[in-house]
């Protein structure tokens, strides 16, 4: 059981952001490779801890090696993987995913997609003697809630179907077999040329669609004829900014609304997945958008998943960046347990389980911890966000530390309340004695009796209320 890998990447400041005269301009102050302090436009500070933070001087190679390489390697070995770039328009999603160009780009600037393609075929060629591989490539765009085949534009409305053994499928989508990275990149370039490009005030060439690159890697073992299939999906999401900020109108406004609807659906699915069982049962609204439906297997756990939160470093975009980072924090709590989709030989299926008692206990413990954290994380996160203590609940150890801290603080304040009450009791006792003495001095036995009855009943009600 592993968490989703969530990283943030701050691109260099644009020339417009550099010209901003109102501030020194930068909203993130690095603490270490995983943690930074974020300052919003009201100068409130939030500390974020993610799996890795890439600042403006980070290289494309570093992002690939940390975020994508392990997922690509597993996909070649039959474990599904998904890599998503998320963030507002102009935050660096496409730069991170593709680089300045897929084919004719210098080595240094190459994005995740061409690196994944090269890495995949390199790994395949180094293990060709133990297995035969078949790689197929598809490429689709989700635009205005329609899935369009970017490798065959006549297929403008691909249907999404579900199959018990293969999971989510794009019915009739073009799947081109590719035998090396040059061929794969050529097809990707064809697909990219077909991508719908809209215009908004914020970025004259911003893409207004989600784009998914899908690789199916089938491995036929030379030795025992076992077949493993790994699906690797890379998704470059459309920009997540608010429609009103773009100043868009007409069709562009409709595009922005549709994009926001599908990104909200993605947020809702993540919320449902990370909120634990609810009164409504655990309904996960995958069907609310094409995007969440296509990502259903990835989000539902049968896939390794990495999310790159692309951010502007500028205070001008602080509110969008804050919501991007909060989205990332939320996604971090999705639990994934990807399995290799291996078709076993009959002999392998008969083999007795070699799982030890300790391993079973470990698994049960993990499940218990998982349930506990699912229920507690939301409450804790809300409290800590309110208190300005944004944190990363990476492990149960962290949950326990946080709990211990809260419990000890609660005990301290209860102790203080008990001390105050004891002092109050002492003061009242002294007053009581004084009143009784006064009554005796006045020689009024009847009044003393009434007074003492009054005091005892007041005393009793004080301590039972
Ligand atoms: N890490 C980076 N290093 C250098 N330049 C970058 C980096 N990230 C982004 N840029 C530049 O910033 C600009 C916007 O980036 P990009 O087009 O990737 O944004 P985007 O998030 O994909 O936007 P959209 O939602 O419109 O697709 C581009 O000119 C890009 O070259």
Swiss-Prot record:
SUPFAM superfamilies, sorted: P-loop containing nucleoside triphosphate hydrolases
A GO-annotated cellular component: microtubule
Keywords linked to the UniProt accession: ATP-binding, Coiled coil, Microtubule, Motor protein, Nucleotide-binding
GO biological process: homologous chromosome pairing at meiosis; megagametogenesis; microtubule-based movement; pollen development; seed development
Comp. bias regions, Basic and acidic residues: 341-358
Coiled-coil stretches: 402-444
Disruption phenotype annotation: Partial seed abortion due to defects in megagametogenesis. Defects in pollen viability.
Keyword Coiled coil carried by entry: yes
Keyword Nucleotide-binding: yes
GO function terms (MF aspect): ATP binding; microtubule binding; microtubule motor activity; protein homodimerization activity
Annotated residues for binding of ATP: 87-94
Residue numbers spanned by region Disordered: 338-358
Tissue expression profile of the protein: Specifically expressed in ovules and anthers.
Job description of the protein: Kinesin-like motor protein that promotes synapsis and is required for proper crossover distribution in meiosis. Plays a role in the nuclear division cycles during megagametogenesis.
Subunit-structure text: Homodimer. Interacts with WIP1 and WIP2.
Name the record gives this protein: Kinesin-like protein KIN-1
Organism: Arabidopsis thaliana
Gene name linked to the record: KIN1
């Amino acid at each position: 059981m592993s968490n989703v890998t969530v990283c943030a990447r701050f691109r260099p400041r644009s020339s417009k952001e550099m010209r901003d005269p109102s501030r020194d301009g930068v909203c993130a102050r690095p603490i270490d490779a995983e943690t930074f302090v974020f300052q919003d436009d009201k100068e409130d500070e939030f500390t974020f801890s993610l799996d890795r933070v890439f600042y403006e001087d980070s290289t494309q190679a570093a992002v690939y090696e940390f975020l994508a390489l392990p997922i690509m390697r597993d996909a070649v070995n039959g474990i599904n993987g998904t890599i998503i770039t998320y963030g507002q328009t102009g935050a660096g999603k496409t730069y991170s995913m593709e680089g300045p160009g897929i084919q004719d780009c210098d080595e240094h600037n190459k994005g995740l997609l061409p690196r994944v393609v090269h890495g995949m075929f390199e790994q395949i060629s180094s293990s060709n003697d133990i297995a035969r591989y078949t790689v197929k490539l598809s490429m689709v765009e989700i635009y205005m809630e329609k899935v369009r085949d970017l490798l065959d534009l006549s297929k403008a409305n691909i249907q999404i179907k579900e199959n018990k053994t293969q999971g989510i499928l794009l019915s009739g989508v073009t799947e081109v077999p590719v035998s090396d990275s040059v061929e794969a990149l050529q097809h990707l370039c064809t697909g990219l040329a077909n991508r719908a490009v809209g215009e908004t005030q914020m970025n004259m060439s911003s893409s207004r669609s989600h784009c998914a690159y899908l690789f199916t890697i089938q491995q036929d073992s030379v030795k025992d004829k076992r077949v493993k299939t790994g699906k690797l999906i890379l998704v470059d999401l459309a920009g997540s900014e608010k429609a009103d900020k773009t100043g868009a109108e007409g069709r562009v406004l409709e595009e922005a609304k549709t994009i926001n609807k599908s990104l909200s659906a993605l947020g809702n699915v993540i919320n449902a997945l990370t909120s634990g069982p609810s009164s409504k049962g655990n309904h996960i609204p995958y069907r609310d958008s094409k995007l969440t439906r296509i990502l259903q297997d990835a989000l539902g756990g049968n896939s390794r998943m990495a999310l790159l939160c692309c951010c502007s470093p500028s205070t001008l975009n602080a509110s969008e960046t804050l919501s991007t980072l909060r989205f990332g924090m939320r996604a971090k709590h999705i639990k994934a347990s990807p399995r290799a989709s291996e078709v076993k030989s009959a002999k392998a299926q008969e083999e007795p389980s070699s799982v030890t008692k300790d391993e079973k206990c470990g698994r049960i413990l993990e499940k218990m911890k998982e349930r506990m954290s699912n229920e507690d994380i939301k409450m804790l996160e809300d409290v800590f966000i309110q208190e300005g203590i944004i944190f990363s609940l990476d492990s149960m150890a962290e949950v326990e530390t946080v709990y211990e801290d809260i419990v000890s603080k609660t005990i301290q304040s209860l102790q203080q309340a008990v001390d105050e009450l004891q002092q109050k009791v002492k003061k009242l006792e002294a007053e009581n004695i004084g009143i009784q003495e006064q009554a005796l001095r006045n020689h009024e036995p009847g009044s003393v009796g009434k007074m003492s009855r009054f005091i005892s009943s007041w005393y009793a009600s004080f301590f039972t209320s």
